[in-house]
Regions:
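Amphipathic alpha-helical segments that form well-ordered structural scaffolds
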Residues: 1, 79, 83, 101, ...
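Feature captures the FAD/FMN-dependent oxidoreductase FAD-binding
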Residues: 2-28, 153-160, 167-177
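Mobile amphipathic helical/loop "lid" adjacent to a hydrophobic cofactor/ligand pocket
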Residues: 5-118
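Secondary-structure transition/turn motif
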Residues: 21, 29-30, 180-185, 283-287
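Active-site rim elements
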Residues: 67-71, 132-138, 217-220, 289
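Helical element adjacent to the flavin cofactor pocket in flavoenzyme catalytic cores
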Residues: 120-182, 186, 190
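Conserved FAD/dinucleotide-binding core of flavoprotein oxidoreductases
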Residues: 127-139, 197-202, 270-289
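Mid-domain catalytic core of redox enzymes
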Residues: 162-280
């Protein structure tokens, strides 16, 4: 770790879900898996005893019994939307407790794998000891993560090339790779392709020596998911006191998140203090194509 003590992270008080019909809070839940789900179910106003009696119990238990192999075998061919329909949650409960997390995967529910959704719900609700109120970075990621990571990697002997485009791969001498770039080529024993879908498809398409036809077909079949919109606003006045730093939304059109950055990190806080304004970011996930 670049920061073994994780000193750039700070806890948040809550991750509220804001809707036109009422809000949901995740503050005060126990961190113990399953007990947190039980307490949330007990205290939410969107689920009553009669509602719980109508819930599809086997489908709901799939969230609590996540097993990578078994879950993907059973649910990977089911869409997230179909799975959420099968749960038979009341509309308000689905909107506040499930829709926000499903949508934050940046995939439309009609296209997303139910197994992927279950994996995410498992992590948030039953596998994460921090529960649903998470830590946030108290400074920009550039200062908190990427610059320190670069310094550490260079200290360990790694080379970092900024602003260099990888164009293609070629295998030479049996077990050596040459990475063709827009500058000088690089040689390596192993190469990891970690880029966005259009980038990896372009590199693989231009590469020689990648003779696994099935793998090439899998790469060619990759699709780019729907767009994720971010609108950062530098306001000339402060937002209302008590606003959460990070809040999910549901039932308000395409808006999925409102972040008040001076409540999260030091750079925005300094700007807000200096100007008397506020730094607000609005997110919209999985926008229609």
């Amino acid at each position: 770790r670049v920061d073994p003590e994780l000193g750039f992270l700070k806890p948040t008080d809550d991750y509220p879900i804001l809707t036109p019909t009422g809000n949901e809070s995740f503050a005060g839940l126990t961190h113990a898996p399953l007990f947190n789900v039980a307490k949330l179910t007990w205290r939410t106003e969107t689920l009553g005893i009669r509602d719980l009696m109508k819930v599809n119990v086997p489908a709901a238990l799939a969230m609590l019994r996540f097993d990578f192999g078994a879950t993907y075998a059973a649910f990977d061919q089911v869409t997230a939307g179909a799975y959420l329909d099968a749960l038979n949650f009341p509309p308000l409960a689905r909107q506040r407790l499930l829709h926000v997390f499903a949508h934050s995967c940046f995939n439309p529910q009609a296209d997303m794998s139910a197994a992927d959704l279950l994996q995410m719900l498992h992590f948030y609700f039953t596998a994460n000891h921090d529960g649903l109120v998470f830590d946030v970075a108290d400074r920009p990621f550039s200062r908190g993560i990427f610059q320190p990571l670069g310094v550490l990697l260079e200290r360990l002997g790694a080379g970092i090339r900024m602003g260099v485009s990888a164009r293609a791969l070629e295998r030479r001498d049996g077990d050596r790779w040459v990475v063709e770039t827009d500058q000088e080529p690089l040689t390596a024993d192993l190469v990891v392709l970690a880029t966005e879908v259009p980038g990896v498809k372009a590199i693989v398409g231009a590469s020689r020596g990648l003779d696994d036809a099935d793998w090439r077909r899998q790469v060619d079949s990759l699709r780019v998911t729907n767009a994720f919109a971010v609108w950062r606003l530098w306001l000339d006045r402060p937002v209302a006191r008590g606003r959460a730093g990070f809040a999910g939304t549901a039932g308000v059109g395409p808006l999925d998140n409102i972040s008040v950055y001076e409540n999260l990190e030091d750079e925005s806080r300094a700007w807000a203090t200096r100007t008397g304004g506020s730094v607000v970011e609005l997110h919209a996930y999985a926008l229609p194509a």
